[in-house]
Amino acid sequence: MSIVHKIESCLPTSLVEFWRLYKKYRAKQKQYARKIEQLRQANRSIRVCFFALDASVWKYDSLYRLMAQDPMFEPTVLVCPIVNAGRKTMLHKMDVCYNDFVKRGYKVLRSYDEQTDSYVDVASLSLDIVLYTNPYHGLIDDRYYIDNIKDALTCFVNYTFAIIPYKWAFAQPLQQLVWTYFCETDYHKDLVLKFTKPLHPHCVALGYPIYDEFHDAKRDDSMWKSKDKSLKRIIWAPHHSIFANEENEDDVEVRWSTFLLYSEFMVQMAKKYQDKVQFIFKPHPILRQNLYKH
């Protein structure tokens, strides 16, 4: 056992975790400084890659298209494998995501080739900026986690408009290690800086990309079966948290899902008011697997 490991073994877990994160943070800051200097000297467009996981939580269409229209950028989407729900689910979600982005006209790549059982090497893509859309470690294959992005700037734009002032929502290790954290509002920026202290990232409040679509007069409403404007439209989007926090069974703060309480009621309402109201069911992507566990 090395002297460093011996010292770490004598320290509280929280202090060891902070020390390890601090070392990563320092290394990342040096990496970003080198990359910025390289880009300043390069006379070419900037290669940006969105790391996408699930088409149902993709909120970055307007951002991708703005980059695609600007000669300064070369945007690409890399569909990353979700590895915490089994191989079948991983492959299905990758197929759905890839096909959706192809239909949108994106330049899109699969990170995993099922036929050859091989993964895309991020280094081979020669990326300048990687944009993360989900902060949680263990969700995607570690090949694509921030620890293994060695020669690119990294950014984070959340997959959701956060409404909860909890540290775990704003201070995951990835959120602290990125080059720039683009958040929704000044309120969110204050929370990021509060919870990530002293290892906070460069944080900028720029709004939320999907809300750009409210300015688009040609918004897509193809998801609605009926185009009858007299029908009211209701989207029911229950959260996945039908259980308490698995790390703390006494923590009920994250049990936000009302699915078990209202599922039968919502079916009854859809039938009762089918001539007056049109419903869309849009559950959180992992609600289904949590229901199987219930």
Predicted regions and their residues:
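Membrane-proximal basic amphipathic "stem/tether" segments
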Residues: 1-44
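Conserved phosphate-coordination/catalytic loops
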Residues: 26, 30, 54, 253-261
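A short, charged/proline- and glycine-enriched loop
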Residues: 38-49, 72-73, 150-152, 228-232
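Glycine- and acidic
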Residues: 48, 173-175, 247-253
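Active-site and donor-binding regions of nucleotide-sugar-utilizing enzymes
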Residues: 49-215
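Conserved catalytic-core segment of nucleotide-activated headgroup transferases in glycan assembly
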Residues: 59-63, 69, 209-294
